[in-house]
């Protein structure tokens, strides 16, 4: 960096295997302990292509690390309310506090744990996901999702807000529309927190769509 500018390290790579990256993160680019813990728990796998990343060692805000890359069959575990996923392909960009993913994946798996007991599996998935993370909460927004699964064609959107202070109530708003679908798959979209009575009523009331 030139005089008067903040020091910045720039990384550019055509191809990057994510599997061995997690153990090296702390030594290559030290981050706050809370962020490092999240990175370890995610246990990311897969491949990045066309990687662009900036590291500002003296920065104290979310711009300390910023990035953009094409994802190829990326997977990660659930942590801090964030979902688990497999076979994530698309374009990702962001920094330590916010980001977005433009998803275009085949054989896509998403698990909104612990809200839903089982992962959702789809033949094809296209979506826009945006997130923010700070010391108070993690927010994940999907303004549009279009997927193709065994149950039919699905359009959905959701907002999930998870508070770091567990004494505060978390929030979720999920809307799912099923076209040319099979009502047998209704239980797949029923949150685990529903009462047994309401869950049973929904299972039997929704037959097709």
How would you label these PLM feature ranges?
Residues 156-158:
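Polar/acidic, low-complexity leader/linker segments enriched in S/T/G and N/D
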Residues 87:
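Active-site pocket-lining segments that scaffold enzyme catalytic pockets across diverse folds
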Residues 1-78, 90-98, 102-151, 171-209:
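Extended amphipathic, helix-rich lipid-handling scaffolds
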């Amino acid at each position: 960096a030139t005089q008067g500018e903040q020091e910045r390290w720039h990384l550019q790579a055509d191809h990057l295997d994510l599997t061995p990256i997690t153990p090296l993160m702390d030594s290559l680019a030290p981050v706050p302990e809370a962020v490092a813990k999240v990175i370890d728990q995610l246990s990311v796998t897969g491949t990045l292509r066309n990687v662009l990343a900036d590291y500002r060692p003296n920065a104290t805000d979310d711009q300390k690390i910023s990035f953009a890359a094409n994802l190829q069959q990326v997977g990660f575990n659930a942590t801090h309310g964030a979902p688990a996923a497999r076979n994530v392909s698309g374009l990702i960009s962001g920094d330590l506090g916010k980001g977005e993913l433009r998803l275009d994946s085949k054989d896509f798996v998403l698990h909104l744990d612990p809200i839903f007991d089982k992962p959702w599996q789809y033949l094809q998935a296209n979506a826009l996901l945006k997130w923010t993370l700070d010391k108070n909460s993690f927010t994940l927004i999907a303004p549009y999702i279009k997927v193709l699964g065994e149950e039919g064609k699905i359009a959905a959107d959701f907002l999930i807000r998870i508070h770091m202070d567990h004494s505060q109530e978390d929030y979720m708003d999920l809307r799912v529309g099923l076209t040319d679908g099979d009502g047998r798959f209704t239980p797949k979209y029923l949150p685990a927190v529903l009462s047994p009575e309401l869950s049973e009523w929904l299972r039997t009331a929704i037959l097709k769509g």
